[in-house]
């Protein structure tokens, strides 16, 4: 379905690290003209053209989504939810709202930072309201996406290969570990 979208809002995802396969698909979509906006916390280079971007503290994701929802409601001539009556939208929120309002096939995608935030339910509720108001769908970019993608791509031990647990249980002479912080990235439960 991603290939048919013309507007996408990605919230709380370090796309290249957390969801590299999705990042590639979004990169291709952007090349075809899909307008992609982001609300993120890292300010990293997504290696794709963004229509609008708000880089905020993780604690400000919900507030930023509230600003987008208010701007979108005003753009669409819809009623602003009473709970958000005092919310003022900044220029970036208005730019994101304008993009979403102009789309026919819209998706709001929540990444790892958004779904793991202490206020994840508020973030999800606001994102769902934005998706509904823009006539789109809400989606979740889950933490296991890389694992599933790697499996589907065949990046698993072949004949005679060993899993990470087997390599630790039966030590090898050498290990090559790239782009990993073993103490931070590996759950040895």
Task: Please name every model-derived segment.
Residues 1-189:
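Cofactor-pocket helix-loop regions in the catalytic cores of large enzyme subunits
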């Amino acid at each position: 379905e991603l290939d048919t979208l013309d507007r996408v809002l990605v919230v709380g995802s370090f796309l290249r690290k957390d969801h590299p396969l999705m990042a590639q698909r979004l990169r291709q979509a952007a090349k075809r003209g899909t307008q992609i906006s982001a609300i993120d916390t890292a300010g990293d280079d997504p290696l794709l053209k963004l229509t609008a971007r708000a880089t905020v503290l993780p604690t400000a994701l919900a507030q930023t989504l509230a600003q987008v929802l208010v701007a979108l409601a005003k753009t669409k001539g819809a009623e602003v939810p009473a709970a958000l009556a005092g919310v003022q939208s900044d220029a970036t929120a208005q730019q994101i709202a304008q993009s979403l309002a102009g789309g026919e096939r819209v998706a709001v995608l929540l990444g790892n930072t958004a779904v793991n935030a202490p206020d994840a339910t508020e973030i999800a509720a606001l994102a769902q309201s934005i998706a509904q108001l823009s006539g789109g769908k809400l989606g979740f970019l889950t933490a296991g996406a890389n694992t599933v993608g790697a499996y589907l791509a065949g990046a698993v031990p072949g004949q005679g290969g060993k899993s990470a647990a087997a390599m630790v249980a039966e030590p090898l002479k050498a290990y090559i570990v790239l782009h990993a912080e073993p103490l931070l990235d590996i759950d040895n439960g």
